[in-house]
Amino acid sequence: MNTIHDQAMNYVYQQVLQRLLSFFSRAERTALQLLIQRLVVAAGGMERMGEYKVMVTPSGTRDSCYMLALLRAAQLSIAGRAPATFQLRVATLRRSESGTAALNNMHRSFAALFLYDDPRVELLMVEHRQVLPFNHLAPLGMDSANAHRTNLLMMGHRRARGEKLEWRDDACLARAEFYGQIARWSNGVDAWLASESPRRQKQFVEDLDRAVQKAGIGALKPNSGTFDELFALLDGLGGDLYRGFYSESERQCWRPEGGFESCRRTTFVDIHDMAVGNLEERWPLLSEFLGFEAEEWVFHQGEGEYADPLIEAHLRGLEAEFISDRSYEAGFSEHVQRMLANMQLQRVPEPVCEQMIARLGQRQTTEELREAAASWLHQTYGLNEAQWVCLLFTPFIERGAGLERFLRSCHPGMLVALPDLHRAMQGLHGPEQVMQWMMDVSGLPVRLIGHLYAMEPLPAHGAARQTLETALDAAGLDGSGVGDRSVER
């Protein structure tokens, strides 16, 4: 670049900074100065800032877009007062459930913050273990969707008896693998910045410990339960956290090959204490400056966590109907009550609670909501209701210990083929119709079903995770109608 162009761009960047700062409160400006000081110390002094590379991994949520804006303000503030500022790597993980709203939110944030075309900034997207330039318009590849579906099923079928189906196992494993590899790619980064609280850091590490055990690659080494040791833990696990499920020829390597050999040591910089104020105070920055738009079905589910309550309630409804011999409506309504109680405990704004009730309890019948959830799950993962029900039963692990119960409950006509099913899962010859039925009902190829057949379930997770549910049960949340319960503090 020539000097005139550099001067022009520096002027543009300073204008962006001034507009960004105009949305900051006094407390946020103080937090910005503390963030700058923290980065200077981590880099080893202002004179080394130009060589320092920082990574963030936004997901398109309100919190991630807000923290990116704060970090960009720090980068541009340092650029205005020092010879050089830090380099920034912005990397996002693309998965089947990565909705267009989240990608569009990130794109609008990147554009508003002038991250595109800034040579100090890398904008990356990882899909199916391939590092690509960020592109919010790129469709999800078929290979990526197929791999994600298979990983989700394999992790889900490794649940302990009586353990509820949750999204966190596969999501946690995928994100951990992503963090470890994207931090090493192309000469690596010096620091990863994240705003998770100590409680959420501990929860992630605990979830990761259980997830790697489900994936068949052992347990984590003893650790402090914080992100300070996360990269050391990930280095010890290796780059392929799903290798316990697949043969060497079936595994997909990280690409571009040879780009993940960096020995640069990545440290964690905790910025959870930099998020000051509340959502109402941040909303002008999010909506007017960053162009953030929330999808109608996204509700706040606690500290920095976002989920689709319709899908979660749908799965609980299926569990009630097929596993617990209750009605779908009872399981669905009970879970909505639990989510609402959790939101109240987290002091989520009243209008948000009321919005969830209106979305899930009044305007549509339960059958309409069930159809909407089933349609989304099929479009997103390519799995029909019968395949989700199969996953709820986990009939294949432990040498098919739960297979007969599954057949009696859902497919009594296949009981006559029970011996053939066991032989097929043992890798022996079986009737073609039986093999095809196994694939149709599970969504998995027979060879992977056979792999599950030889695996043991993990022990139950323990009583800790059930503490909240026990407390909610004691409070009388017994699955009564959503619309019958007022939202009171």
Task: Please provide the spans of the model-predicted regions.
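A phosphate-binding catalytic loop at a beta-strand-loop-alpha-helix junction
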Residues: M46-G80, L286
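Nucleotide-activated chemistry modules centered on ATP-dependent adenylation/adenylyltransferase
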Residues: M1-E51, Q87-A111, D117-R489
